[in-house]
Each structure stands twice: as structure tokens, then as C-alpha cells.
């Protein structure tokens, strides 16, 4: 199982949006994140980068 930490705009500790993300969906200009506990966060923006080997995702906020 590949779990990732999602960051907003840049990869820095203070920009972490969610950890242990297991599902990412891009829909209607939003990136919807779901973690292991089935919690969801929606960010208005686009998926900028996803590195599943290193376990990080960067979402560019609008």
C-alpha cells in the first residue's frame, strides 16, 4: 500500500494538508484527499506533483 503526505504549494512541514493519504480524486477544479481513517479534505486547485516512491504529493492551490 502506498500512502502519501500531501502538501499545499510546496514541500515544507508547515504546508502539510494531510498525512496517510490513500486516495486522491481530481474533480471540478478540486483535489479531494482521503486518508486511512476515511477523513476527507478538498482543496481548490490542481495536482502539481505526485511521487509515490518517496510518498509525497504537492497540490497547487488556486
Annotate the PLM regions:
Residues 2, 6-62:
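Compact, glycine-rich, soluble single-domain proteins
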Amino acid at each position: 500500500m502506498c500512502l502519501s503526505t500531501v502538501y499545499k504549494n510546496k514541500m515544507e512541514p508547515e504546508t502539510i494538508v494531510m498525512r496517510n493519504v490513500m486516495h486522491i480524486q481530481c474533480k471540478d477544479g478540486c483535489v479531494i484527499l482521503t486518508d486511512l481513517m476515511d477523513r476527507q479534505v478538498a482543496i481548490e486547485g490542481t495536482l502539481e506533483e505526485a511521487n509515490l516512491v518517496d510518498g509525497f504529493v504537492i497540490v497547487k492551490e488556486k
